[in-house]
Amino acid sequence: MHPHGVLYDKDNEGADGGAGASVAPGKRYTYTWVADKAAGPGPADPSSIVWLYHSHVMGEEEINLGLVGTLVITRKGMARSASNPLPRDVDQEFTVLFMIFNEENDKESGLKHTINGRNFGNLDGYEARLGKRVRWHVAALGNEQDNHTVHWHGQTVLAHGRRTDVVEVLPASMTSVDMVPRSPGDWLLHCHVNDHMLAGMATRWRVLP
């Protein structure tokens, strides 16, 4: 399991050459990663940022089988408590991974255009309240097809000082943006690349009054 961003030594890299390069079936390995200052938010970042981690043994095949996840790191002194890392300057954090899972060796029928592994609106649980502070952690992974333009209907986000309603992510890139919902209702969240959206890379999320 290979992480991005955090501090690790060779045995905890999760790639060729270290003790943790691979874990055999039925075996265990404990990785040690450090969220040091260089892994946390930079001066121009929001108070929490996102990193990816994923398999690096048969990277392409195993990532396409779902061996991928995210880490969120909060700036030192900004967490609500030792047991609650949610930053004090936001009310909620959401994480979304935009990825085309390739399950059948590039055959179109095996390309699953997903948000968090779900497509065609089958992603539940994303609700916020009007006027609350919401941070969206957005990531992408995959191949040259995984250039995504993430679009929120009805709302805008603040992305590194820039106001927009679309953010761009490339394969293995990550970004964190802030939103204060201003319009209640059920809203689309989707990739604005036309064939990605039509193939199912879209869902609804809810803003409560």
Where in this protein do the model-derived segments appear?
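Copper-binding active sites and cupredoxin-like electron-transfer domains
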Residues: 1-209
